[in-house]
């Protein structure tokens, strides 16, 4: 909102800068324009700043000694200077960056800096736009040491922190895949912290090796994207039936199949919830921002270790590659991680599937623990004894026990928080990496007199305990997500009778806040 000022969001999008030197007759003819005014022909309504950037750069650098090709490469810096004027930004940071980048080519650095200033001065001297903007820099909400971090690195750090908190070694079995590979790269740098990384021959081996590491007593993780989850599903199910702690990180990308490897979507939600054979319950957590990836990864590990279950952590390409200022955490402020280890006094009457009566969690006997030799596997087991069983009643009981264990996790996760007006006419609902866009849309609408509220889900399965109570308070609910309505359908199944509208886009791109505002405003008017 500080960027938008009093003019509002739409006004920011009414400026386009173009190099008028690029619109020569032959160029327009090649582009099949019928007139010499392509903007009018296309019906562009924004204010177009037509600036002869190429010719002005040539004139400015004619005595620089650079060849024509090198001079024209400076055009972007002229445009950047004009943008800095438009947004009332100092050129100091850009000048510093250019001097550092071209330290070995000072003549290139100085040429770029010269046209950078030319662009700024052009805007100031010609009053190139009818209005300018000011971006106010806010101080951090809390004091501390901050660094810039992206989602993949934050995920890696969250995994390391959880392993340290639990007193375990961290094992990553992975296979490179866009856009998740950077987690593997980052973790591989930290052997000194007890991290073991194995780049396996394929996705299946990556997950299967992690299941083995979980049985051996490590905090086990595998990282991938949607296509990789398809291949890992059988090994993931081995962790389900074996009731082993495993974290599966899915950095979602555009699909299906190879799809759009470098683009972002939220299309793997139902895959995370149900994309395995049999009744295969698995907790699902969705990170909401680059910095939240640390907390989400930490909590995924905590749930996996304390409840002896595989956990899916969903991020996406937008969150994974996006960056933000991150306050370095104090691990003393994070909750303890206490795996349900067997104790020596249990040895005399212990069985492999013996459970804690309160949580339904089976106890963890890592190999080498004296008196607790046992076996597990992918075949159905007899309740408690762990022997292979095909008895109908036993299978029915085991299916319900595994489901109840995951359902019980709702007692250990935060309740759903609602932001905005208590008497809102519309509740905006989102999940995962769309948090920032939806929050901005709500804030803008409230600033303009609309009564709206916002609830964003990080915990998907199980849902927070107060989910039904929250959602049933509102007459109108809109679920916005980057798929065709997967979470909306999931909510309808879990909380029947809701009046849910949907805002769905599957473009491989983040939401445009203006489009969200327009759609939500229209819903309010219906």
Protein language model features and the residues they cover:
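Acidic, Ser/Thr-rich peripheral helices and adjacent loops at domain boundaries
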Residues: 30-42, 265-273, 330-344
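Active-site/ligand-binding-proximal alpha/beta "capping" segment
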Residues: 279-302
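Single conserved hydrophobic/aromatic residue that forms the stacking wall/gate
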Residues: 2-9, 13
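Short internal beta-strands
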Residues: 15-22, 172, 249-250, 455, ...
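Thiamine diphosphate
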Residues: 96-275, 280-282, 286-287, 506, ...
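Short gly/pro/ser/thr-enriched loop/turn and capping motifs at secondary-structure boundaries
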Residues: 23-27, 56, 204-207, 228-231, ...
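Aromatic-enriched
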Residues: 31-151
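Flexible, low-complexity linker and terminal segments
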Residues: 149-158, 166, 296, 301-526
């Amino acid at each position: 909102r500080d960027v938008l000022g009093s003019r509002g969001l739409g006004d920011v999008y009414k400026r386009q800068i173009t190099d008028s030197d690029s619109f020569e007759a032959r160029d327009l003819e090649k582009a099949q324009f019928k007139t010499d005014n392509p903007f009018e022909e296309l019906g562009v309504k924004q204010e177009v700043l037509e600036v002869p950037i190429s010719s002005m750069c040539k004139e400015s650098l004619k005595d620089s000694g650079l060849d024509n090709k090198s001079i024209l490469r400076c055009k972007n810096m002229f445009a950047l200077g004009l943008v800095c004027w438009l947004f009332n930004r100092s050129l100091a940071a850009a000048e510093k960056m250019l001097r550092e980048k071209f330290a070995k080519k000072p003549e290139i650095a100085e040429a770029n800096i010269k046209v950078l200033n030319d662009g700024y001065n052009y805007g100031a001297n010609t009053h190139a736009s009818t209005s300018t903007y000011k971006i106010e820099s806010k101080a951090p909400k809390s004091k501390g040491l901050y660094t810039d971090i992206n989602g993949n690195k934050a995920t890696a750090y969250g995994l390391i922190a959880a392993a340290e908190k639990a007193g375990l070694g961290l094992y990553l079995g992975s296979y490179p895949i866009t856009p998740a590979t950077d987690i593997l790269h980052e973790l591989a740098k930290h052997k000194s912290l007890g991290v073991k990384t194995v780049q396996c021959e394929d996705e299946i081996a990556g997950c299967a090796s992690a299941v083995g590491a979980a049985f051996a007593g490590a905090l086990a993780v595998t990282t991938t994207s949607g296509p990789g989850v398809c291949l890992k599903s059988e090994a993931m199910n081995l962790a389900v039936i074996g009731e082993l702690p495993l974290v599966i990180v899915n950095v979602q990308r555009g699909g299906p199949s190879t799809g759009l490897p470098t683009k972002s979507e939220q299309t793997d939600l139902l895959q995370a919830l149900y994309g395995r054979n049999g009744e295969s319950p698995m907790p699902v957590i969705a990170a909401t921002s680059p910095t939240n990836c640390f907390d989400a990864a930490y909590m995924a590990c905590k749930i996996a270790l304390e409840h002896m279950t595989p956990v899916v952590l969903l991020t996406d390409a937008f969150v994974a590659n996006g960056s933000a200022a991150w306050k370095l955490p104090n691990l003393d402020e994070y909750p303890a991680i206490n795996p349900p280890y067997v104790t020596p006094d249990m040895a005399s009457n212990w069985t492999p599937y013996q459970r804690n009566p309160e949580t339904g969690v089976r106890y963890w006997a890592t190999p080498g623990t004296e008196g607790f030799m046992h076996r597990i596997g992918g075949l159905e087991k007899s309740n408690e004894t762990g022997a292979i069983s095909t008895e109908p009643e036993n299978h029915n009981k085991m299916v319900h026990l595994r489901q109840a264990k995951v359902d019980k996790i709702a007692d250990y996760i935060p309740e759903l928080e609602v932001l905005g007006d208590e008497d809102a006419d519309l509740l905006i609902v989102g999940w995962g990496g769309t948090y920032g866009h939806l929050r901005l849309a709500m804030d803008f609408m409230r600033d303009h007199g609309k009564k709206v509220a916002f609830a964003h889900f990080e915990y998907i399965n199980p849902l927070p305990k107060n989910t039904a109570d929250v959602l049933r308070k509102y007459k109108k609910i809109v679920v916005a997500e980057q798929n065709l309505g997967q979470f909306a359908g999931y909510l309808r199944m879990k909380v029947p009778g809701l009046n849910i509208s949907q805002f769905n886009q599957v473009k491989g791109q983040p939401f445009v806040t203006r489009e969200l505002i327009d759609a939500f405003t229209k819903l309010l008017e219906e």
